[in-house]
Every structure is written in C-alpha cells, then in structure tokens.
Curated annotation (Swiss-Prot):
One of its GO terms (molecular function) is nucleotide binding. Belongs to the dCTP deaminase family. The lineage of its organism: Archaea, Methanobacteriati, Methanobacteriota, Stenosarchaea group, Halobacteria. This is dCTP deaminase, dUMP-forming. It is an enzyme of class 3 (hydrolase). It comes from Halobacterium salinarum (strain ATCC 700922 / JCM 11081 / NRC-1) (Halobacterium halobium).
C-alpha cells in the first residue's frame, strides 16, 4: 500500500519515518510522496583514456571520480550526455515496515533530466542522504540549483516488517552516507567482499 499524504504526515509525527530537514511541509509533502531537494555535493566522472574501469578495483573507481561542492548562489551545469552523482539535502530514515522509491519530478523530466539510472529503491532500515544518479538526456545544458526540489520519495508499506533490514548489522555499504557515494560494488561477495 502506497502511503498518502495523511499517512506520511502521521508517520513523520510518530517519528519512525524521518526526513530532515523537512523545512516546508506544505510544499514538500505531496498527495502520495515527499519532494526532496538537491544537495550541494556532486561526484563527476572524469573522461579518461582507459579501455574500461574494473568496478571491483577501488583505485580505478576512485581515480576517475572528482567531487564538486556548489557554493551559495551558484549552480551546477548538467551537460547533455553527462552522468553525475548528486545527493539529497535531506537525510532519510526508513523504518523496518516501509520501502521508499526515488522518482523524478515531471517538471525536470520534461527538461530531459533523470534522477536515477537503476538505484531507485530504498530498503527498510536505510538511514542517510539519498545518492541521485543524475543524467541529462537532452541536447542543451541544464542548470541545477542546490535546494531545488529534485525528486520525490514514494513510501510503500510492507506486508510485515523486514526481519533483516538494511543497516550496520548487515554491513550495508551505503548506510549513513552523508553525500554522494561512488560505487562500492567491490564489497559484493562475487568480488571478494562480504555482501
């Protein structure tokens, strides 16, 4: 069951669902979602003369990623064909009986901006800022301003609370992230990790 605005507000008031800072409830809480705003930090992938990046080699992934922090009053220009990682301003804490889905806002979609490539699902137990996989599918650059409403979170109630939620007990790779995170796929079992 997808939570309505009434359900979202009740869960926020109870404190088991947290979205902070939620500075303008009337603006951000929609009929069946919550608009979240763009943070100031971005990870950009450098164009390099390499045949490929091996996801399981930390040095290769880290070598081709640079962080940009947008200052007050400035904007981040997302160029056609670019893919960058951004983050939400808000931290989100999802209780054991809910999942969240990251969806794009229609107004940005009409400018050819997408907010996630594949990672649009937030597990029960997640706590942190949401990493956004931003792309410009259009033909002209788009200026993104920190604190603009960039995406929406849709919450769905599980049939029962998760017995093994996302989090520290599972060694979850992205728990408590405070900004955009590059791939940590090297932590997966098939690459010698524990997950």
């Amino acid at each position: 069951m997808i939570l309505s605005d009434q359900d979202i507000l009740a869960r926020l008031a109870d404190g088991d669902l947290a979205i902070e800072p939620l500075e303008d409830v009337d603006l951000q809480v929609q009929p069946a979602s919550v608009d979240v705003r763009l943070g100031r930090r971005f990870l950009e992938f450098e164009r390099a003369n390499v045949p490929c990046i091996h996801p399981n080699r930390e040095d290769e992934v880290d070598e081709y990623v640079t962080e940009t922090v947008v200052e007050d009053g400035d904007e981040f220009i997302l160029h056609p064909g670019d893919f960058v990682l951004g983050t939400t301003k808000e931290r989100v804490e999802v209780p054991r009986d809910l999942v969240a889905q990251v969806e794009g806002r229609s107004s940005l979609g009409r400018l050819a901006v997408v907010v996630h490539a594949t990672a649009g699902f937030i597990d029960p137990g997640f706590n942190g800022r949401v990493t956004l996989e931003l792309s410009n599918l259009g033909k002209v650059p788009v200026a993104l301003t920190p604190e603009m409403r960039i995406s929406q979170l849709v919450f769905t109630e599980l049939t029962s609370p998760a017995d093994r939620p996302y989090g520290d007990e599972r060694g979850s790779k992205y728990q408590d992230q405070d900004g955009p995170q590059a791939s940590r796929i090297r932590g997966d079992r098939e690459f010698g990790g524990t997950q």
